[in-house]
Amino acid sequence: MKKIFTILFCVASISASAQNNYSGRYERPLSDVLKSIEKQFHVKIKCDIDTAGKKLPYADFRIRPYSIEETLDNVCKYFDANWWDQGKNTYKLKVYEYARRHTSDGEKMLCWLSAKYNNKEEWEERCNLLRKELRERLEIDAYLDSCLKNAKPQLSKVRKFDGYNVQNICLETLPGEYLYASIYSPAKKGKHALIICPNGHFYEGRYRKDQQQRLATLARMGAICVSYDLYGWGESKREHPNHRTDRAHVIQAMDGLLLLDWMVKNRAKEIDMERIAANGGSGGGSLTVLLSALDERFTAVAPVVSLASHFDGGCPCESGKPIHLSAGGTCNPELLAMMAPKPVLVVSDGGDWTASVPQLEFPYLQRIWGFYGSESNVRNVHLPNERHDFGKNKRQAVYNFFIDVFHLDASKLDEEKVTIEPASSLQTIPMTKE
């Protein structure tokens, strides 16, 4: 028996040795390679990829003793994976994400884009190309052409609160498909600004407290705000349980444009066409940027905790259609720059992918606005000690922006006056068939 064990041990040793030579492609198990890297660079490596049974050829030759980042690059590329620095000498390996890149990649992208235009004329030529290809890749016009033209909406009773009113709307868009929204209006009659407010992937969607606070407060100050469900969220989930689709990408953009059309047509006496905006956070910020690039009626926009040159949006509803391949390649900051020289606010923080905005994306935007001599029209409020949310300071930045550019009534700014309604009150489903 001892002799058998000895033979098996020798065979295993020979086999391992055979792997660690030229004919064996210097192959090593991935799990062992990662342990070696941890030890050599004094780091911790977390894995979201399955390492079981995976082997890395020329493993030791992929290690760059002077750079943990280049080493991880060389390892990850073989397995179609990527790495992310999580701070405190910790790195995470994840499967490749087409919409997410490193900050350094974003910097290279903006440099490449900036070289394409050095004045207003070159920039506007680029805009025309972007606008055309963006619509084609999103397929938005095919969807809009298929929409019902004279569908009669279902409207709830108007609910009256302190300085503002709320009414729900259900609008059939495509045959058998519905858009669900709530309209927050100033109690005072007159011409008002209109703000389309797509929401992101925050818990409870458009029914959450901070969304109601923001829209109601803006309404109290003099803006009509329209909040609508993401495709496959809220009421829409009853019809479309699968939110993470590329179809959601175009439907959500279509819904925003249809709401703008409906409001302008049916409440024309209340809408000041010189004051049309979009404002949303996270995925709602991505949608805000997209809406502004699709429709020139927007006169101001404010994407919150969303904008980055190295992240297109982590959900297919933000990046499922290949819009970022438009015009040879683009990114959300360039799409947002199509608003120039109109007023734009970018709200960013230090706790998510927007941490790079003050040093990277904002200078790029300032350069574009500079082509028009309007650098002051693009603004960045950066909150380095905050995280990914739509908290009070972020809402305050939005209030200040619209008070300035839309001349809202600052004396009405008081979130304590807002009544937080249950989700059921903001839904139209009771009026639709089960």
Q: Where on the chain are the PLM-derived regions?
A:
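Sec-dependent N-terminal signal peptides
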Residues: 3-13
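Cap/lid segment of the alpha/beta-hydrolase catalytic domain
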Residues: 190-266, 307-317
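Primarily recognizes the serine-hydrolase "nucleophile elbow" in alpha/beta-hydrolase
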Residues: 261-328
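The feature captures the conserved acid-bearing segment of alpha/beta-hydrolase catalytic domains
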Residues: 300, 312-367
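Flexible loop/turn segments at secondary-structure boundaries
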Residues: 177, 202-205, 233-236, 285-288, ...
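Alpha/beta-hydrolase-fold serine-hydrolase catalytic core, especially in secreted/extracellular enzymes
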Residues: 58, 65-68, 84-178, 190, ...
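Loop/turn elements at helix/coil->beta-strand transitions in domains of secreted/extracellular proteins
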Residues: 191-194, 221-224, 272-275, 296-300, ...
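N-terminal export/assembly leaders
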Residues: 18-98
